[in-house]
Amino acid sequence: MPTISQLIRKGRKTVASKSTAPALKECPQKRGVCTVVKTTTPKKPNSALRKIARVRLTNGYEVSAYIPGIGHNLQEHSVVLIRGGRVKDLPGVRYHIVRGALDSAGVADRLQGRSKYGAKRPKQK
């Protein structure tokens, strides 16, 4: 424990919190271009083929981003919007692609949680 005079001389250092999405550079979203679109398998004990894309951002970073929802229209050179948010069972994937923005189409036939997947409200009869 420091003495009063040590505190007067040096003071306390504030601990800077580490960003969970450093490639965004404090922005809410960033635009980027898909370089690779592929599937990967999650960590144990889960089993699936998760859809991910490697995205080169406008600030020069290249990151892996998860493609949420069932089915997608993304391919190489698609322009996408990414947001922060990791996928717990995919190591190294710390970003999500925003569905329904730029070249990424919304999820078809989605009725619940539509705003998260860029799906329009279905027509009423």
Swiss-Prot record:
Modified residues (3-methylthioaspartic acid): D89
Keyword rRNA-binding: yes
Database matches in SUPFAM superfamilies: Nucleic acid-binding proteins
A GO cellular component entry from the record: small ribosomal subunit
CDD domains per record: Ribosomal_S12
GO molecular-function terms, A-Z: rRNA binding; structural constituent of ribosome; tRNA binding
Entry superkingdom: Bacteria
UniProt entry keywords in alphabetical sequence: Methylation, Ribonucleoprotein, Ribosomal protein, RNA-binding, rRNA-binding, tRNA-binding
InterPro entries reported for this sequence: NA-bd_OB-fold, Ribosomal_uS12, Ribosomal_uS12_bac
A biological process from GO: translation
PANTHER family named in the record: 30S RIBOSOMAL PROTEIN S12 FAMILY MEMBER
Family note: Belongs to the universal ribosomal protein uS12 family.
Function: With S4 and S5 plays an important role in translational accuracy.
Subunit structure: Part of the 30S ribosomal subunit. Contacts proteins S8 and S17. May interact with IF1 in the 30S initiation complex.
Name under which the protein is recorded: Small ribosomal subunit protein uS12
Organism listed in the record: Clostridium kluyveri (strain ATCC 8527 / DSM 555 / NBRC 12016 / NCIMB 10680 / K1)
Species classification: Bacteria, Bacillati, Bacillota, Clostridia, Eubacteriales
Protein's gene: rpsL
